[in-house]
Amino acid sequence: MKKVGMHRMKFLSPALVTGANGFVGGHLVEALARQNVKVKLLVRSTSKIPFKPTTNMEICYGDVTDLESLRKAMKGVKVVYHLAGILRGSNFSSYRSVNAEGTRKVCQAAAENKVKRLVYVSSLSAAGPSTEKGPIDETTVPKPVSFYGQTKLMGEEIALSYKKHYPVTVLRPGAVYGPRETDIFEYFKMVAGGLVVIGGADTQKISFVYVDDLVDAILLAAHSKKAEGKTYFVSDGQSYHWGDITAYIGKALNKSYVTLKLPLGLVKMVASAGDFIANLTGKSILPPIVSSDKMKEAQVPGWACKNTKLRQELGFKPKVGIEAGIQKTVEAYRTAGWIR
């Protein structure tokens, strides 16, 4: 199928983006603004916007757990891009309150305001891991292994239950990387420092997608009739070991490094200690990728998915391969002063 160019697309406007100050949300907001879409940014009052707002952006202070703030933000909105969620919580309830019940409130407010379309950006974690047999696809029965994945799946089910009110599309991206990303950035930082610490065996195969390609997929999903009521995986179509990724990062940085493999049991102990301190103090001392919940995702064969359905039905064609994407990301990190 021939891809519909973004320049030929009639964009729905105004749009509301939840999680607009986040990594993917910020890139989506900027892409919409470039297309002269009026964008409402739902952010908390304490949040920092990682880019300079333009005249066609409106900042709406609120929270996905606050129905009244959602109702107010959605007045006059035609399309909702729901990206808000939490990657790290203290228990199952904390994940559910945002990823599931927050999604319910977003969908309810959208229905009350008679929006025309909703795209829910979920996660590969909602589907569960791939196996030794290879990448999973949309026919695979979801078997999430973490609280994060379980509650994102709950969010998917809630969003799709509102399709009688407006068309809904669910996207499940693999690992997303690019400028301003802060979790996978830890690997870039380790390579830059010359020491890469890996917990357990480097045997998992993982699907990645560059942030600009994910934004393209989100916009395609929001403006395609074929996407209504459907779920799609989003990736660059390949899968990689973490060793491959660190090698590409080393090449982009022109840095040599040493890899230190720690027993998974030790990493789990560190993650548990970090969770305990976070629950006690309310402050996290470890990055989100090092948590007890994420350790559940580290003990499976892989996180690889196919993008065949997205390509065939919506004409999705990723523009940025892994090496080029990592090079772009390194350049952005250096420009921002995050790494040398």
Residue ranges and their predicted role:
Residues L220, S224-I289, Q327-K328, R340:
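Mid/C-terminal beta-alpha module of Rossmann-like enzyme folds, strongest
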Residues K2-K3, C305, K309-E313, K317-R340:
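Amphipathic terminal alpha-helices
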Residues S97, T131-V176, V196-G200:
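Catalytic helix-loop patch of NAD(P)-dependent Rossmann-fold dehydrogenases
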Residues Y61-E101, A109, L124-P129:
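NAD(P)H-binding glycine-rich loop region in Rossmannoid oxidoreductase-like domains
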Residues A15-Q35:
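N-terminal Rossmann NAD(P)H-binding glycine-rich loop of SDR-like oxidoreductase domains
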Residues V211, A247, V270-N279, I285-F316:
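Conserved C-terminal active-site "lid" loop/helix of NAD(P)H-dependent oxidoreductases
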Residues Q150, M154, E181-E186, G200-A222, ...:
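Substrate-positioning beta->alpha
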